[in-house]
From Swiss-Prot:
This is 3-methyl-2-oxobutanoate hydroxymethyltransferase. Pathway: Cofactor biosynthesis; (R)-pantothenate biosynthesis; (R)-pantoate from 3-methyl-2-oxobutanoate: step 1/2. Keywords: Cytoplasm, Magnesium, Metal-binding, Pantothenate biosynthesis, Transferase. Binds 1 Mg(2+) ion per subunit. Its cofactor is Mg(2+). One of its GO terms (molecular function) is 3-methyl-2-oxobutanoate hydroxymethyltransferase activity. The keyword Transferase applies. It catalyses: 3-methyl-2-oxobutanoate + (6R)-5,10-methylene-5,6,7,8-tetrahydrofolate + H2O = 2-dehydropantoate + (6S)-5,6,7,8-tetrahydrofolate. Transmembrane segments: none annotated. GO terms for cellular component: cytoplasm. It is found in: Cytoplasm. It comes from Desulforapulum autotrophicum (strain ATCC 43914 / DSM 3382 / VKM B-1955 / HRM2). It is an enzyme of class 2 (transferase). HAMAP family: PanB.
Amino acid sequence: MQPRVTTTTLFKMKQEGKRITALTAYDHPFATLVDAAGIDIILVGDSLGMVVQGKQTTLPVTMDEILYHTAMVTRACNRAMVVGDMPFMSYQSSINQAVDNAGRFLKEADASAVKLEGGADVCPVIQAIAKAGIPVQAHIGLTPQSVHQMGGFRVQRDEERLVSDALKVQDAGAFSVVLEGIPSDIAGIITKKLDIPTIGIGAGPGCDGQILVLHDMLGLHDRHLPKFVRQFADLRTQAARGLEQYRDAVRNGSFPAEEHGYK
């Protein structure tokens, strides 16, 4: 069995120039596959609201819902670092609320770390959670929980603010930072300035690692994919074909056959 990926593992990978791989997962079967594939980080993202629950944004996801999914994922993983995504309004009201909710991911769901969105504005929260002994992954740029404030899912281009936010979340104690929806050149500048690893999603090839939503890259749905997504499989088409074959086999009497019964 390979050793578990830790924050130290990720720091070393950045120092050695080894690319970090990350994906989302939301349940035990898929987390088992992702972990077995050697993916370094599994994020149990609040994106589950959109890709699993069928909602329009990530905002309605609750702590209890994401803890339920995180626990399923951690039970499947032997190597990958499992990061729990702190949902909207689970850390914004007070620092005490944020620390308590972050702690629930480790105590109740056996996660290794938490992720939260925001730059300079959430640095006191990052600092408090990290001080409590909980590893924190930051997330700057396009932050889906602020979709209404941003006026939609828009690429973020303010280089000065983005670089400043990245440096500040690092100083606050984040062990890594997700860069989402940022021009490639700015993401590259940030990556070179930081000591902690950068994980890109729609931020170009210059980041220390990459993350995608599992359902997007495996082709598990038919919704519009962002420009930055590469589809590595078409499981929806394969699943539809299998379901249709099952339907036809039951209707024409070829399933179940004699070998599927007991004597």
